[in-house]
Amino acid sequence: MKYDKSILIQKLIHHEGLVLQVYQDTLGIDTIGIGRNLEDRGITDEELEDMGIANIDHVYEFGITEADAILLAENDVEIVEDELLRAHPCVDRLDAVRQLILIDMAFNMGVPRLKKFKKMWAAIHDENFTVASKEMLDSRWASQVKSRSTKLAHAMYSGEMNG
């Protein structure tokens, strides 16, 4: 993959937020850091060890540091990237900006839901990024995330990431 992971993490912080205490997201799911779903994904023993935290109860009581949140997000991005490449190997051939956009979208909605954007994927395979960007906006996801979808669709169209 060509995209800069540190830029992606900054975009995810902007889009998802950075919360160092456990909170409930809009669906009532316990979440922490940069959108880490504690009910589906949790925090592995290895991640707790890497963060120097004894157990998950400590996370619920005291929260995590920004460095911990970034570590969790980097691990999540790695998983999302692997899932996305298995589902759509063509992502590896895209430029860095468009890779970043698709990883951002997959991070937000999950790869299974992103796979349902069939017209967008057909346009990406044809390198028709004008149509791909329009298909991004013609979705329930776009109505849910509003400005995020507009920014990402513009970047898909132009090949340039702004702001």
Q: What do the predicted segments below correspond to?
A:
Residues 26-54:
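Substrate-binding/active-site groove segments that recognize
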Residues 31-33, 101-104, 131:
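Structural recognition of the beta-strand scaffold that forms the well-ordered cores
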Residues 1-21, 27, 36-40, 70, ...:
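Long, amphipathic alpha-helical surface segments
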Residues 51-88, 96-103, 108-114:
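Alpha-helical segment that forms one wall of the substrate-binding/catalytic cleft
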Residues 19-23, 86-97, 135:
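Surface-exposed patches in mature extracellular/periplasmic domains of secreted proteins
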Residues 9, 29-31, 99:
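A residue-level signal for beta-strand positions that form part of recognition/binding surfaces
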